[in-house]
Amino acid sequence: MVFRTGSGVAGRGPELRLYDTSDRQVRPVSAAVAPTCKATMYVCGITPYDATHLGHAATYLAFDLIHRLWLDLGHEVHYVQNVTDVDDPLFERADRNGVDWRDLAEREVALFRDDMASLRILPPHDYVAATETIVEIVELVDKMLVSGAAYVIDDEYPDIYFRADATLQFGYESGYDRDTMLRLYEQSGGDPRRPGKNGELDALLWRAARPGEPSWSSPFGPGRPGWHVECAAIALSRIGIGLDIQGGGSDLIFPHHEFTAAHAECVRGERRFARHYVHAGMIGWDEHKMSKSRGNLVLVSTLRAQGAPPSAIRLGLLAGHYRADRFWSSQLLDDAIARLHRWRTAASMPAGPDVADVIARVRGYLADDLDTPKAIAALDGWVTDALEYGGHDAAAPKLLATAIDALLGVDL
């Protein structure tokens, strides 16, 4: 194999298997069927009104592992990530701070990308902002109006809504019952009881212009796009239907990812927007999920400013399984710093035990639904042997460091 993300080592890992949210089981990722083909992935990016917290970092770290494993398998990877720079939280924060929303978005996007680079998260092939995709969004909304999948509400502000029943398969990605959908829909800013809507779950596609709000021209009047259609338009215009993975945090399963898929499927007439739906668990702090609205954030930039090594932050997040909801703590960071020190000490030794078996096991664990706890445990075992007993393979320490860099993204 050759580690495509680093310098060369021989060998090749097993095909990637991931938990699919819509199927509720771990199964092979479709790109593995043809190793020479291009693997495609669309992951929802940030709404740039505040700094990157560890919940963001954990999500993008999970998809970074997928990116790295695909490269290790020999795939070319087309990875697209959006920036939701048209959204109420951004406008509200900019108004509160007395700054232009575009300046706030630009500043926070720059900080986000700097944080991601510090954590050695490979950048997407395309970063695409919603404001860069207005033409494509308008085309998508227009197609849904023409087909009858969308309608204009009779109101002072003629907003456009998507019919949740426009596709027969609506609901397959989340698998949630209607009561759960309604609860999550309202929690995420939906308006199930708005007068004039055909259905409670119908989702906003185009918000007609209001005084003091940004707006763009369209054949159906000035306004701005709804949340879900932004991602559908970006994914379809950059990748197309049938992408290998649609991903993001588990808090996006419904309504965001369900509606993004439904919009795309409705326009393209396809049964599935993506072949695999992958979602990362939430990171908590102070007994609650980390979120901007709650304010219980541990910021990547703050940890870095306090002197935490970015590789240790990464290792701390990798210590838990990507799908698990879990809590961050100062003890977790301390443990990661200690582990990083041990790994670096072992990697700097003049010789060590043979690494072929441990590299094969690490690849196998990662290929099995990104089982980073088992991969780390295997590496800890090699490091313990190296530090306690040494070894006779002069190439082993450097070879293992290269593997850790390429597969886990941890720089030794």
UniProtKB/Swiss-Prot annotation:
Motif ('HIGH' region): 46-56
Motif annotated as 'KMSKS' region, chain positions: 289-293
CDD domains: Anticodon_Ia_Cys_like, CysRS_core
Enzyme class name: ligase
Keywords in alphabetical order: ATP-binding, Ligase, Metal-binding, Nucleotide-binding, Zinc
GO biological process, one term: cysteinyl-tRNA aminoacylation
Binding-site list for Zn(2+): C44, C231, H256
Co-factor(s): Zn(2+)
CC cofactor note: Binds 1 zinc ion per subunit.
Reaction(s) catalysed (UniProt annotation): 1D-myo-inositol 2-amino-2-deoxy-alpha-D-glucopyranoside + L-cysteine + ATP = 1D-myo-inositol 2-(L-cysteinylamino)-2-deoxy-alpha-D-glucopyranoside + AMP + diphosphate + H(+)
Pfam families, A to Z: tRNA-synt_1e
Motif residue range(s): 'ERGGDP' region: 187-192
Enzyme Commission number, as recorded: 6.3.1.13
Binding site residues for L-cysteinyl-5'-AMP: C44, G45, I46, T47, T59, N82, V83, T84, W227, G249, S250, D251, I283
SUPFAM superfamilies linked: Nucleotidylyl transferase (SSF52374)
Segment forming the signal sequence: none
PANTHER family, per the entry: CYSTEINE--TRNA LIGASE, CYTOPLASMIC (PTHR10890:SF3), CYSTEINYL-TRNA SYNTHETASE (PTHR10890)
Protein name (Swiss-Prot/TrEMBL): L-cysteine:1D-myo-inositol 2-amino-2-deoxy-alpha-D-glucopyranoside ligase
Primary gene name: mshC
